[in-house]
């Protein structure tokens, strides 16, 4: 959870905050979703949009 908040403060990009979508789409588990939070870093942004 700590990572999540940090990510939020760094940038408000969609990938950083949507916890709700994670429940809607069961393609990826919430866990995988949280990993995508790294997308705040520029490297992961593109990947993040996939989720």
From Swiss-Prot:
One MF annotation (Gene Ontology) recorded for this entry: DNA binding
Keyword Ribosomal protein: no
Intracellular or extracellular location(s): Nucleus; Chromosome
Tissue specificity note: Testis.
Pfam families, sorted: Protamine_P1
Gene Ontology cellular-component annotations: nucleosome; nucleus
Superkingdom to which the source organism belongs: Eukaryota
Record function comment: Protamines substitute for histones in the chromatin of sperm during the haploid phase of spermatogenesis. They compact sperm DNA into a highly condensed, stable and inactive complex.
Family: Belongs to the protamine P1 family.
Descriptive protein name: Sperm protamine P1
Species, as recorded: Trachypithecus johnii (Nilgiri langur)
Gene: PRM1
